[in-house]
């Protein structure tokens, strides 16, 4: 595994995130999200960075999430400002390392297709879909109730670049419609890497990327997943620190490059990857 702890320096990452959020040469707009006074400066910056329409879409997402969360388990975070810092900002923070990894290899990021595996409450997929309207997103979620929420969120946010697929990752990975069809697979807080790799890599085309949002110290997970990742046709590309307002003050993005076709026997039957990891 190549563990270069990141494709760019900490200062460069902050600059990339700033440009992502604020836009180069574009004047920041007044936020539509009425964040509480306890919200951090970073969360406020993230809110002001988006266009008026994008701010509105994020606001509608947060409103829908907190409303539906009263009736079903979508998130343990129930405060609006915490949703901004721990979900919205964290989701946006994976974009700079992802785009850097893509463009540094000569890739065109104008029309990326991304599958959010185990999307849950739509994180990071729905937030990334707001930030990158030219990309095509598929939210893959196995629980019907959560899919109903995702479909509602897509509708109220007026997102035309998002599809919701209610299926298990193991089934989708063996489906002709989805197998090795995405430029990028992304996952956040779904499972440990050696399990997650079997969910995600069969969905990624050869030459595409798998990015996993992880905690502040994923090194043991990375070591444990090395053999599984190799069997699935990929190798580690980078490990990046990303800006985070989480409890540890830092998260990481682990990036893998899909180098070879995944053997047909993977992913295995639903439930097997988690019960018997590679």
Q: Which role fits each region the language model picked out?
A:
Residues 146-148, 218, 222:
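Short alpha-helix immediately C-terminal to the canonical SAM-binding loop
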Residues 92-191, 197-198:
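Conserved SAM/SAH cofactor-binding pocket of Class I
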Residues 1, 6-8:
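Cysteine-centered motifs
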Residues 78, 166-168, 238-240:
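Short loop/edge segments at beta-strand edges and connector loops
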Residues 194-210:
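A short glycine-rich, Lys/Arg-flanked "PGG" loop and its adjoining helix->strand segment in the class I
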Residues 4, 19-115, 145-162, 269-270:
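Class I SAM-dependent transferase core
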Residues 6, 223-278:
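SAM/dcSAM-binding transferase cores
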Residues 142, 190, 213-217, 241:
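Short strand-turn motif at the edge of the Rossmann-like AdoMet-binding core
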């Amino acid at each position: 595994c190549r563990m270069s702890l990141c494709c760019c320096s900490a200062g460069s990452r902050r600059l990339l995130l700033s440009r992502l959020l604020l836009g180069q040469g574009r004047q920041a707009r007044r936020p539509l999200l009425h964040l509480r006074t306890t919200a951090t400066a970073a969360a406020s910056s993230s809110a002001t960075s988006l266009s008026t329409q994008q701010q509105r879409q994020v606001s509608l997402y947060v409103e829908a999430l907190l409303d539906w969360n009263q009736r079903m388990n979508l998130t343990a975070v129930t405060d609006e400002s915490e949703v901004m810092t721990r979900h919205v900002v964290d989701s946006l923070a994976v974009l700079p390392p992802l785009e850097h990894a893509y463009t540094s290899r000569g890739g065109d990021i104008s029309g990326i297709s991304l599958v959010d595996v185990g999307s849950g409450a739509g994180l990071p997929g729905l937030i990334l879909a707001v930030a990158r309207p030219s990309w095509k997103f598929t939210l893959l979620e196995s629980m019907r109730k959560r899919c109903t929420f995702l479909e509602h969120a897509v509708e109220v946010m007026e997102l035309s670049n998002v599809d919701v697929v209610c299926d298990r990752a193991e089934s989708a990975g063996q489906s002709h419609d989805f197998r090795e069809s995405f430029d990028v697979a992304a996952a956040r807080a779904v499972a440990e890497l050696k399990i997650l790799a079997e969910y995600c890599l069969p969905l990624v085309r050869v030459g595409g990327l798998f990015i996993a949002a992880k905690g502040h110290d994923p090194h043991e997970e990375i070591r444990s997943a090395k053999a599984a990742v190799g069997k699935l046709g990929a190798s580690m590309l980078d490990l990046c620190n990303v800006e985070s307002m989480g409890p540890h003050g830092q998260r990481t993005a682990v990036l893998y490059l899909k180098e070879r076709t995944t053997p047909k026997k993977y992913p295995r039957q639903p439930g097997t990857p988690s019960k018997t990891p590679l």
